[in-house]
Amino acid sequence: RVAISDALQDEETKDQANTWYVAGYIGYKEFDTNNLNRQMGRNIDVDAWGASVMESLNYWEKAYELALVPTYDKKGKAKYDTRTPKLILPKVTEYYNNSVLISAGFNAYEANNPSLAYDMFIAHVNIPELKIMQDYPEEAAKLLRDTSYYTCLYYAGRFAYEAERYEEAIATLERMNTEHANANALRKEVIYANEYIYQIYIEQGDTVKAVESIKKSIDLFPE
């Protein structure tokens, strides 16, 4: 980590996509080791497992950003780094499908850290929204958005509420309400989400928006 930390600041290497990929790969190897140990029934540090994923995702976002920056040969022809994205994509998909951040997020919540729990849950549900996934729709299609995905959004909003990160709580819960296709499949979560939104607006003194949030539940579930 010391060596790669230096490379991330070195003038000759800090703007190279591969430098940031390698930085993220360190966290990935920690994830991979922990994942193998878990499969073998060994105890693992779930918090460290989640932290390594968060770290590598951040590094790989930067790596992909740099991979999109062209370099030019002597003839002035633009060249792009196509290797780095191909290295990142399967690993990000693996993170999502293993729900590592969900496990680590619940651990954080149980340790009375709802703010960190929110960060981990929202990082998980945002994986399909990463630019690299959007630019490779065939890979993004492999990331399921079933009821579990929207349940994660609900919990992320709830954790943000408990962490008093109210703007993020509203945005996340509204996102769940807006994106899900089948309200009946998430009846309980939709009702609770609007109750959290209602409570936030009441605490902020905005009765108009508070009433609107409850009306949404009534309109969906008039019975």
Predicted features along the sequence, with ranges:
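Generic helix N-cap/helix-start motif at coil->alpha-helix transitions
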Residues: 96-101, 145-155, 185-195, 220-223
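Structural signature of tandem alpha-helical TPR/SEL1-like repeats
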Residues: 165-171, 204-213
